[in-house]
Amino acid sequence: MTLLNQKPNSKAPKNGEFLTIKTANQWIDEAKSKPIPKKIFGPFWYKEELCILFADTNQGKSLLAVQIIDSVTKGTSTLGLEMELPESKVIYFDLELTAKQFEMRYAQHDKDKDILFDHFEFSEQFLRAEINPYGYDVSVEDYESFLFREIENQTTESGAKILVIDNLSCVISDNEKAKNTTPFLIRLNNLKKMYGWSILLIAHTPKRNLFAPISRNDIQGSKSFINLIDSCFAVGESQKDPSIKYLKQIKVRYGAFQFPSENVVVCKIGKESNFSSFKFLEYGKESEHLKHFDAADKAQVKNKAFELKESGYSNVKIAMELGVSEGAVRKWLKQAEIEE
């Protein structure tokens, strides 16, 4: 494999030295020579972090990812969030869209003539990769291993130190099972450490409870993934208006939570001229954008609670599933017993 201006850590352990042991003071002395991590997308994503961005389908994950890449490759901030790096090369592994679908998001459309014009101009530092269906030889190795190796090879050969993978579903055949995704995240973490890469991985969330705040339990596959990454944030949809989204921190390693439930970044998604993007509106509370119970909703949720109880769920687990308090579940079940 050819590396262009990019080498793994020269102090990497020799073959056979899987675990490197030093005193705590030695580790600290070694770390003193390394710079404090810089922000790539405000406090959501720092340099040399493995970060996951997740949301439900059609919530603008890919649009936000491209918006972040555009800011990094041009050395500018976006959404009022600090970007502390100089303009940098980024490689975007777009494993979902075709080139035409990508083009349509970043051009104006003359509906009368049915043509695209006034295309948005990205930096030449922005590299995009998509799958060549003729490039995979099924007889050589399994698809997931082949794709992972290609991601490593193409990134090292490009010289990029920042990469975005869109998305996890296209890399892992069954990412609802932790046993399938855990090895992939471990391998990504190893690449991050070997090459000093900054990695943003896009993931879906299964259909979630719109009455409850977004949490690590909503990430596709398993909340245990959180333990394998450095940071994580989510895009939520406002129940006031589907074009309004909010960004919420789920996990941080550097610093404190700046954008938890009580202080989410509220944006409006749309296309201005030739660029589909998020536009900053305000900071707000997540509770203002969640679905709220009315009489019909409450009856539906109570019935669901009864179904879950019959399925063997504990009161605590029912409360977590439905986004209500454990006390409310206990009250509903007690009322049901009295009515019987």
Listing of model-derived features with the role each one plays in the protein:
Residues A12-H109, F117:
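The Walker A/P-loop phosphate-binding site
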